[in-house]
């Protein structure tokens, strides 16, 4: 996962973040100027082609310069099965769309989204928003 020390944030551009799940993918949007994230949508994750057609439509609409994928690390920091799926999804995003992908530790983001008052149908998008905000927050102003 990224280490912000010594790295600079791009000056401008849109960022899409994904909270990957086997059934649904939460999506958030932000940009490097405001460094604020907002929940965007939830994509159904039924077929591989359907998933990437939906992502392609978002990329075409928002023209991001960076993609972020939440990495579901277990509470002790170790590997868990869903990490492989999230890592594969991020690698596929990079391969299909040629955009840089970074992973962000998503521990407890779904719980935080629920505690923040996100309704049941909005949890995945709100979790993606939290993931993206964590990404922005790791860089000093």
Swiss-Prot record:
Family matches, as InterPro entries: RNaseH-like_sf, YqgF, YqgF/RNaseH-like_dom, YqgF/RNaseH-like_dom_sf
Segments crossing the lipid bilayer: none
Entry's EC annotation: 3.1.-.-
GO CC, alphabetical: cytosol
Record keywords, A-Z: Cytoplasm, Hydrolase, Nuclease, Ribosome biogenesis
CDD domains: YqgF
Tagged with keyword Nuclease: yes
Subcellular location: Cytoplasm
Keyword Coiled coil: no
BP term (GO), one: rRNA 5'-end processing
GO terms for MF: nuclease activity
Gene3D superfamilies: YqgF/RNase H-like domain
Protein family according to the UniProt entry: Belongs to the YqgF nuclease family.
Cross-referenced HAMAP family: Nuclease_YqgF
Role description: Could be a nuclease involved in processing of the 5'-end of pre-16S rRNA.
Name recorded for this polypeptide: Putative pre-16S rRNA nuclease
Organism: Cupriavidus taiwanensis (strain DSM 17343 / BCRC 17206 / CCUG 44338 / CIP 107171 / LMG 19424 / R1)
Lineage: Bacteria, Pseudomonadati, Pseudomonadota, Betaproteobacteria, Burkholderiales
């Amino acid at each position: 996962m990224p280490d912000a020390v010594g790295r600079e944030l791009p000056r401008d551009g849109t960022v899409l973040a994904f909270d990957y799940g086997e059934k649904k993918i939460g999506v958030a949007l932000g940009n490097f100027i405001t460094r604020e994230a907002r929940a965007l949508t939830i994509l159904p994750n039924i077929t591989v082609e359907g998933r990437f057609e939906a992502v392609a439509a978002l990329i075409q609409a928002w023209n991001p310069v960076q993609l972020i994928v939440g990495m579901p690390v277990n509470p002790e920091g170790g590997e868990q099965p869903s990490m492989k799926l999230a890592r594969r999804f991020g690698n596929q995003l990079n391969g299909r769309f040629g955009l840089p992908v970074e992973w962000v530790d998503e521990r407890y983001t779904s719980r935080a989204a629920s505690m923040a008052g996100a309704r049941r149908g909005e949890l995945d998008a709100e979790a993606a928003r939290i993931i993206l905000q964590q990404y922005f927050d790791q860089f000093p102003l």
